[in-house]
Curated annotation (Swiss-Prot):
Belongs to the HscB family. One of its GO terms (molecular function) is ATPase activator activity. Co-chaperone involved in the maturation of iron-sulfur cluster-containing proteins. Seems to help targeting proteins to be folded toward HscA. The keyword Cell membrane does not apply. SUPFAM superfamilies: Chaperone J-domain (SSF46565), HSC20 (HSCB), C-terminal oligomerisation domain (SSF47144). PANTHER family: IRON-SULFUR CLUSTER CO-CHAPERONE PROTEIN HSCB. The lineage of its organism: Bacteria, Pseudomonadati, Pseudomonadota, Gammaproteobacteria, Alteromonadales. InterPro entries: DnaJ_domain (IPR001623), HscB (IPR004640), HscB_C_sf (IPR036386), HscB_oligo_C (IPR009073), J_dom_sf (IPR036869). The gene is hscB. One of its GO terms (biological process) is [2Fe-2S] cluster assembly. Coiled coil: none annotated. Interacts with HscA and stimulates its ATPase activity. This is Co-chaperone protein HscB homolog. It holds the Pfam family DnaJ. Residues 2-74 form the J domain.
Length: 175
């Protein structure tokens, strides 16, 4: 089952989230387990399975990074696991710089300003990289798909670092 076909939307990194949500609600109404309360046990089980598949598809397409990964997997792009090291030394250096920047927030004289700076840098770099990956996915050739895969891993790093920023902010301001 192709998730894009299921929701009758074009395969693209950019998805109309309102259309996706509308299609999701329509599909869920047709297979909702409550509709099958008086059906046979097998029909109930099938309805539950279809409902779960629709939920999985919706959650995947709703999230930009999961959507990108899904597109690349559908194109048979080999996705390295999280433990596979980056070959991009400049990005490895950038990771260290960003982590140092985050650590410096704790020792900053103006924690608010330092946090805003980190958040701004992460947001800007995430958006720029996202735009590059969007273009690579739309090109859909071996080289662009491979590059999109590398950029997806970088975007996942930014996403995780943003979570760390949120945790740091919570810990600094909960005291």
């Amino acid at each position: 089952m192709n998730y894009f076909q299921l929701f009758n939307i074009e395969v693209s990194f950019d998805v109309d989230l309102q259309q996706l949500s509308s299609s999701y609600q329509t599909l869920q109404k047709t297979v909702h387990p409550d509709k099958f309360a008086h059906a046979s046990e097998q029909e109930q089980r099938i309805a539950v399975q279809k409902s779960a598949q629709i939920n999985d598809a919706y959650q995947t397409l709703k999230n930009p990074l999961q959507r990108a990964e899904y597109i690349l997997v559908q194109r048979s792009v080999e996705m390295p696991n999280e433990q596979h090291s980056f070959q991009d030394t400049s990005f490895l250096m950038r990771q260290m710089e960003l982590r140092e920047m985050l650590e410096d927030v704790r020792h900053s004289g103006d924690v608010d300003a330092a946090l805003l700076e980190v958040q701004s840098v992460l947001s800007t770099e995430y958006l720029q990289l996202s735009q590059v990956m969007r273009t690579q996915i739309s090109e859909n050739n071996a080289a662009s798909n491979s590059a999109a895969c590398d950029n997806l891993r970088k975007l996942k790093f930014y996403q995780k670092l943003n979570i760390e920023v949120d945790r740091l902010e919570d810990s600094l301001f909960d005291d």
